[in-house]
């Protein structure tokens, strides 16, 4: 909204300083400051309000050190993250940008699913929360919306250096002119390879001519799978104070780097990566999101004054998934979201091995002392602050590795 206001003032009144709102970098800086202030100031009031409503966490007895002290800690703190992200975005971003629209829909959609889950747990006294099938239906529904929009919407394109269709001439960093064309594509990026583009449509090449017309049959299910997997991974990671918020902020910063360079024709040309028109605007959303996560971490760090609940964790996972897909970096998710992957795998391996050994030997055996992975280290006697700090360090290393793939091939 402020973007359009200052655009109007600059155009018709030549208002001093109004032109800076045209720059993504300025609006991104403003967004992170604004969201950080909102989450820290507004967050304190939300926590007090949740405490008065007695919206407290019900802790299951798992035999973990310090677990009983967490009982009654306000939950649903994800509302702080959602509000602190959306308000700066609504004020500073271009609201007619298809990527911004998708991210706003994702935030509200996944936030609603998480809120219902937390509401049922707290007010209906049902520890199971929202039934798993309904969560999956919600995640699949969002995947259908995102996948269909990214595949069919005319503003979702990539630019390649060819001389057909919509030809444009733009200046490269060295001043030379290059012929280019915006086109619809299901291409993505494969890390560590020199010619690192892969088109999902190629998976249907065996069907004969015209296979590209049916690429949506591959692309949309992949989008659904990624959104479901990453949102569940974030949900599993939210187990100890500050873990999910901190690791998510690190992952989102890495995606922010990808988004900025992929949406900038000069940087994308220099790095020889896919240029994605209109995607640079997502940097404003990412900045607001990072600020909201850091501001929330102010209250969620050990000892936590508030938990994000499924309201926050499902929203975080959904946003990260959509960002990665939109910027064509979903194949890097196992790297910059390596913590989510490890948490997910620890649960899958634990459950699968337990069932297998119970069937074969008559008693279930475990790989880890407890899953998800962070509980394994708690059982080994590590304090949760040490676990969180070390997971953050690993997350930073993974984020750096993922960014390095821009040049290392």
Curated annotation (Swiss-Prot):
Q: Which GO terms describe its cellular component?
A: plasma membrane
Q: Does the record carry Membrane as a key word?
A: yes
Where would you find the membrane-spanning parts of this chain?
A: 23-43, 73-93, 95-115, 132-152, 214-234, 247-267, 279-299, 305-325, 331-351, 386-406
Question: What does the record give as EC number?
Answer: 2.7.8.13
Q: Name its cellular compartments.
A: Cell inner membrane
Give me the reactions it catalyses: UDP-N-acetyl-alpha-D-muramoyl-L-alanyl-gamma-D-glutamyl-meso-2,6-diaminopimeloyl-D-alanyl-D-alanine + di-trans,octa-cis-undecaprenyl phosphate = di-trans,octa-cis-undecaprenyl diphospho-N-acetyl-alpha-D-muramoyl-L-alanyl-D-glutamyl-meso-2,6-diaminopimeloyl-D-alanyl-D-alanine + UMP
Q: Which GO biological-process labels does this protein carry?
A: cell division; cell wall organization; peptidoglycan biosynthetic process; regulation of cell shape
Q: Which residues form a coiled coil?
A: none
User: Does the keyword field hold RNA-binding?
Assistant: no
Pathway of action: Cell wall biogenesis; peptidoglycan biosynthesis
Any one GO MF annotation of this record:
phospho-N-acetylmuramoyl-pentapeptide-transferase activity
Q: What class of enzyme is it?
A: transferase
| Keywords recorded for this protein, A-Z | Cell cycle, Cell division, Cell inner membrane, Cell membrane, Cell shape, Cell wall biogenesis/degradation, Magnesium, Membrane, Metal-binding, Peptidoglycan synthesis, Transferase, Transmembrane, Transmembrane helix
Cofactor names from the entry are: Mg(2+)
Membrane topology label: Multi-pass membrane protein
UniProt-listed HAMAP family = MraY
Role? Catalyzes the initial step of the lipid cycle reactions in the biosynthesis of the cell wall peptidoglycan: transfers peptidoglycan precursor phospho-MurNAc-pentapeptide from UDP-MurNAc-pentapeptide onto the lipid carrier undecaprenyl phosphate, yielding undecaprenyl-pyrophosphoryl-MurNAc-pentapeptide, known as lipid I.
The record's comment on protein family reads:
Belongs to the glycosyltransferase 4 family. MraY subfamily.
Q: What is this protein called?
A: Phospho-N-acetylmuramoyl-pentapeptide-transferase
């Amino acid at each position: 909204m402020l973007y359009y206001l200052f655009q109007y003032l600059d155009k018709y009144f030549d208002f001093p300083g109004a032109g800076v709102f045209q720059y993504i970098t300025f609006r991104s800086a403003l967004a992170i400051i604004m969201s950080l202030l909102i989450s820290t100031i507004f967050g304190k009031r939300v926590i007090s309000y949740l405490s008065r409503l007695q919206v407290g966490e019900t802790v299951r007895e798992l035999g973990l050190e310090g677990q009983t002290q967490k009982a009654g800690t306000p939950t649903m703190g994800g509302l702080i993250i959602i509000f602190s992200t959306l308000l700066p975005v609504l004020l500073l971003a271009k609201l007619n940008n298809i990527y911004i629209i998708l991210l706003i829909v994702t935030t509200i959609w996944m936030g609603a699913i998480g809120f219902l889950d937390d509401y049922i747990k707290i007010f209906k006294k049902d520890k199971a929360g929202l039934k798993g099938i309904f969560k999956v239906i919600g995640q699949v529904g969002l995947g259908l919306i995102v996948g269909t929009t990214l595949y069919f919407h005319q503003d979702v394109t990539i630019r390649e250096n060819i001389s057909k269709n919509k030809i444009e001439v733009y200046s490269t960093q060295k001043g030379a002119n290059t012929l280019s064309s915006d086109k619809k594509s299901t291409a993505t990026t494969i890390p560590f390879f020199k010619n690192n583009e892969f088109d999902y449509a190629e998976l249907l090449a065996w069907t004969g001519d015209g296979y590209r017309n049916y690429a949506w049959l591959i692309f949309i299910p992949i989008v659904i799978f990624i959104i479901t997997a990453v949102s569940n991974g974030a949900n599993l990671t939210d187990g100890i104070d500050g873990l999910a918020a901190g690791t998510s902020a690190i992952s989102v910063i890495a995606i922010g780097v990808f988004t900025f360079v992929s949406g900038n024709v000069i940087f994308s040309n220099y790095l020889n990566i896919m240029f994605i028109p209109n995607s640079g605007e997502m940097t404003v959303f990412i900045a607001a999101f990072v600020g909201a996560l850091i501001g929330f971490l102010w209250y969620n760090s050990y000892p936590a004054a508030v938990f994000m609940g499924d309201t926050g964790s499902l929203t975080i996972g959904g946003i990260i998934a959509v960002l990665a897909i939109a910027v064509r970096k979903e194949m890097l998710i196992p790297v910059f979201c390596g913590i989510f992957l490890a948490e997910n795998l620890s649960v899958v391996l634990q459950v699968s091995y337990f069932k297998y050994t119970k069937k074969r030997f008559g008693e279930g055996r475990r790989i880890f002392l407890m899953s998800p992975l962070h509980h394994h280290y708690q059982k080994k006697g590590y304090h949760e602050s040490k676990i969180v700090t070390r997971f953050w360090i690993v997350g930073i290393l993974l984020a750096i590795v993922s960014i390095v793939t821009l040049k290392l091939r």
